[in-house]
């Protein structure tokens, strides 16, 4: 594919999602070009990101369900041993970092870690393999393969990463209000970090405290989502740039980068999980 397109077209093609949305003047449709996808703005959905994220979520549930059905107290198989190792790893991190009493946190942390790891893992597939297959299928259906977009790494889509982080944010708000009460939650936003014994001075400090605490609060999901997106997007872009090089250079660069990228894939899933645990622990704590 790289040989049939200019460098700019090739990169743009690999970074454009399969998008369905509302295009001004044409109505609801699948974007035919990157420009159309961009023009759809917020009135659009990335079909490939949704397909892969939901599909990998189903794979995660299916694997763990299958292991749970066949679990044995004797010598475990390789798959059962791997699942037990992951569960124990997540459980230990929850015990070490979470000070609350909710039983939801461990399953939540496990889901986040494995799901994000599987989505990140898609970045190790050859850059042109799945998009190339999608292009061939599109060609058989009468479409120009250069206008068939199909990204396979959901975590390179900020809609996915921010969607997950803001879902965590909703849980943070829920547990903050549940554990501290509405008054305690509002008090955290308005009475800290600055306080005064003089009531008039304290009233003056309330809007200042609110601005500072609100920025701190809203920065949590934004930084959580953008950190994952930025690292995975950069990794994907490097793979794309390597694919543009001569064949013999591709192997020399892609193999070391893929090996190093395994660390990034695992680390980013771990960081997202740990920050979620820490944020949930802070939300459940009655101490500011």
UniProtKB/Swiss-Prot annotation:
Gene Ontology annotations of biological process type: proton motive force-driven plasma membrane ATP synthesis
Cell compartments where the protein resides: Cell inner membrane
Residues annotated as transmembrane: 47-67, 104-124, 157-177, 199-219, 237-257, 258-278
Disulfide bonds: none
SUPFAM superfamilies named among the record's database cross-references: F1F0 ATP synthase subunit A
Bilayer disposition of the protein: Multi-pass membrane protein
Keyword Transmembrane: yes
Keyword Membrane listed: yes
Record-linked InterPro entries: ATP_syn_F0_a_bact/chloroplast, ATP_synth_F0_asu, ATP_synth_F0_asu_AS, F0_ATP_A_sf
GO molecular-function term, one example from the UniProt record: proton-transporting ATP synthase activity, rotational mechanism
Keyword field: ATP synthesis, Cell inner membrane, Cell membrane, CF(0), Hydrogen ion transport, Ion transport, Membrane, Transmembrane, Transmembrane helix, Transport
Gene Ontology CC: plasma membrane; proton-transporting ATP synthase complex
Pfam families: ATP-synt_A
Family stated for the protein in its record: Belongs to the ATPase A chain family.
Biological role: Key component of the proton channel; it plays a direct role in the translocation of protons across the membrane.
Assembly notes: F-type ATPases have 2 components, CF(1) - the catalytic core - and CF(0) - the membrane proton channel. CF(1) has five subunits: alpha(3), beta(3), gamma(1), delta(1), epsilon(1). CF(0) has three main subunits: a(1), b(2) and c(9-12). The alpha and beta chains form an alternating ring which encloses part of the gamma chain. CF(1) is attached to CF(0) by a central stalk formed by the gamma and epsilon chains, while a peripheral stalk is formed by the delta and b chains.
Protein name, as recorded: ATP synthase subunit a
Annotated source species: Psychrobacter arcticus (strain DSM 17307 / VKM B-2377 / 273-4)
Gene that produces this protein: atpB
């Amino acid at each position: 594919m790289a040989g049939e397109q200019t460098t700019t077209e090739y990169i743009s093609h690999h970074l454009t999602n399969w998008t369905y949305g509302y295009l001004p003047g044409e109505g609801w449709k699948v974007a035919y070009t990157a420009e159309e996808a961009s023009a759809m703005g917020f009135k659009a959905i990335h079909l490939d990101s949704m397909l892969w994220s939901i599909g990998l979520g189903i794979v995660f549930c299916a694997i763990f369900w299958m292991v749970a059905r066949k679990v044995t107290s004797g010598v475990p198989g390789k798959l059962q041993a791997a699942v037990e190792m992951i569960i124990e790893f997540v459980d230990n991190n929850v015990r070490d970092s979470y000070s609350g009493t909710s039983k939801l946190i461990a399953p939540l942390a496990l889901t986040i870690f494995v799901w994000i790891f599987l989505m990140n893992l898609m970045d190790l597939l050859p850059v042109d393999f799945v998009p190339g297959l999608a292009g061939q299928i599109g060609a058989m259906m009468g479409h120009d393969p250069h206008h068939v977009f199909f990204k396979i790494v959901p975590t390179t889509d900020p809609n996915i990463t921010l969607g997950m982080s803001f879902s965590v944010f909703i849980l943070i708000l829920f547990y903050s209000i549940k554990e501290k009460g509405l008054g305690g939650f509002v008090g955290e936003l308005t009475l800290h970090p600055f306080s005064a014994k003089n009531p008039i001075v304290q009233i003056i400090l309330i809007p200042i405290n609110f601005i500072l605490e609100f920025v701190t609060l809203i920065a949590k999901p934004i930084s959580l989502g953008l950190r994952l997106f930025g690292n995975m997007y950069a990794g994907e872009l490097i793979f794309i740039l390597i694919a543009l090089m001569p064949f013999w250079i591709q192997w020399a660069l892609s193999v070391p980068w893929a090996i190093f990228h395994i660390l990034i894939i695992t680390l980013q899933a771990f960081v997202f999980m740990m920050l979620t645990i820490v944020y949930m622990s802070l939300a459940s704590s009655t101490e500011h």
